[in-house]
Amino acid sequence: MSLSRNPLNRRRFLCLLGLSAIAAPLLVTACTRAEAQLDDSFTPVEGEDQSDLLTIGLSLLGSTDLARGQGQGSDQQSSPNRVVSPVGAAAAAGVIAEGATSKVTIDPKRLQPAWTMWRKWAGEPTNKPGAVPVISAAARLLVDPKIPIKPEYSDTITGWDVPIETGKVTKGNLDSWVRTNTGGLVKGSGLTVTPDMKLVLQNAIIFAAKWLVPFKADDTIKYDFTKADGTITRVDMMWLFQHHGPYIASDGWQGVRLDYTDKELSAFILIPDDDMGEVTPTKLRQALSRLVTAQEQTAILKVGLPKFRFTTSKDLKGFFNHVGLGEEAALTKMTNLPTKIIQAVQQAFIVVDEEGTVAGAVTEVGVGAMATPMTGDITIIADRPFYFIVGDAKTATPLFFSYVGDPTKG
């Protein structure tokens, strides 16, 4: 579906959630693994740095499809909303790339800090944030006992905080790890275990934080939200009045940064004047740079943000193929056995309400061993489709990247 050329109907808003140092106790009761088929949308952003997390995030969201008002992959029902973790996907690709001798277009050494930078917020995964924010991050490489891993590779991924565990690759084993490391918020693995799957990389991220300035439930009202196809739906719109905070309202963007409790993690809400298809990583980066703490301009604001919750199950094979980690990738730094990457998936969810935000993602890569003997004054209202990105307030590193096309849809 094409978008209206009326600027009021074609503006979207990006909400980049920059992680704040305090977590919000949200009552999340139904953040479970997505039941839908895998979303296979992937739009490569050519001419951009493929190790850049904003580039990865926009590619995974399928920016061209969003501009057309389309949902997920062509072989499944359309969804107006998507959430991905660029950090989870990039970390999975980076750890696998450390074992590759074939050409890849990402730089693992540059991606590694994006996985390890959240250690100061480490805690148990929860859907009820407390006085301080929690970012629970865990990972492992599960290896069949018959598959020898090179010591050099083992040493390399230790720097990623990725231990190697020896054990049979079974559905029960993978499911148990996912449930344990997401506090039960994701119910099981997204991989389909096959007889030739001998190595599995798993990582999990759970984020929970309270707003520094919470929205008042009594102020939440029904409000019009214009979807990508121009139709209008009614949403639960939360409001902040006389709110002093960072904003932008020029050069093709309206936006605001909403901090979590210690101001180190934040939500960046960005509403582009142009169609979604015209949003590039460069334009997005320029807008974000005006909201980070070093460059912020503040004012008294009136802010409207819809409540939303949804899940996405994402097929990452398009992304892996694009960066040189397709089935033909040579992983000879990892093991001398013939191997191929056979599955790559991510399950993600996000919940935003008056108290704060809870989000999570599980990223998994299944590697097969070949069958051989070797075996206020300014009003900013998110009343049309927007991006919601979770990251830190200083750099806006995108831990989670969401597109919200209809807040009423789960």
Predicted regions and their residues:
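Extended hydrophobic
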Residues: 201, 254-270, 375-410
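Bacterial Sec signal peptide processing site at the extreme N-terminus
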Residues: 33-41
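Post-signal peptide N-terminal segment of secreted/secretory-pathway proteins
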Residues: 67-135
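C-terminal motif of bacterial Sec signal peptides marking the signal peptidase cleavage site
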Residues: 29-30
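N-terminal secretory signal peptides
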Residues: 1-8, 19-26
